[in-house]
Regions:
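Active-site-adjacent beta->alpha loops and helix N-cap segments on the catalytic face
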Residues: 1-4, 18-23, 42-59, 80-83, ...
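Short beta-strand/loop segments at the ligand-binding rim of alpha/beta enzyme cores
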Residues: 2-12, 60-76
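Glycine-enriched alpha-helix->loop->beta-strand junction motifs that scaffold or abut catalytic
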Residues: 2-10, 27-35, 87-92
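Active-site beta-loop-alpha junctions enriched in small/polar residues
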Residues: 12-16, 38-39, 74-80, 96-98
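Extended, intrinsically disordered, low-complexity segments
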Residues: 16, 114-127
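Catalytic cores of alpha/beta
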Residues: 17-28, 64-66, 70-91
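Glycine-rich phosphate-binding active-site loops on the catalytic face of alpha/beta enzymes
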Residues: 34-44, 87-107
């Protein structure tokens, strides 16, 4: 139904996804797959080193490469560690954005301007 309505369905992979399930997800996914870097709730602190996360990411990327799909990393990605993930197809920083919005509102600042500035800084760390 998603493709029929021009909606991209983003599926998730995690460190505990089995190879057989992973292949099914990769085959049925659209242009992008979200790799949940760790078992945690959103906004959690990074568990394990970026090197360990990228090791798992690269294993998945080898499987995906043949299908030309993007693999983005999320969970635990912050302004402090984002440059470690330069080699990924993309990084999800949802909790960082939510924190910036909350802080902006609390300080009676423009959240759109502050989020935009934060994203520019993050972009400069990975490009």
């Amino acid at each position: 139904k998603c493709k029929k309505n021009s909606i991209s369905f983003v599926q998730l992979l995690s460190p505990t996804t089995s190879i057989s399930r992973m292949k099914k997800i990769i085959n049925s996914s659209h242009e992008m797959i979200y790799y949940i870097s760790m078992l945690s709730t959103t906004g959690g602190k990074l568990k394990g080193s970026p090197r360990e996360i990228l090791k798992n990411y690269n294993k998945i990327k080898k499987i995906i490469k043949k299908r030309k799909k993007n693999l983005v990393i999320g969970f635990g990605i912050t302004s402090k560690n984002i440059s470690s993930f330069k080699s990924s197809d993309g990084c999800v920083v949802g909790s960082e954005i939510c924190k910036k919005i909350s802080k902006s509102i609390k300080n009676r600042q423009n959240p759109v301007t502050n989020v935009n500035n934060m994203l520019r800084k993050l972009k400069s760390k990975i490009l």
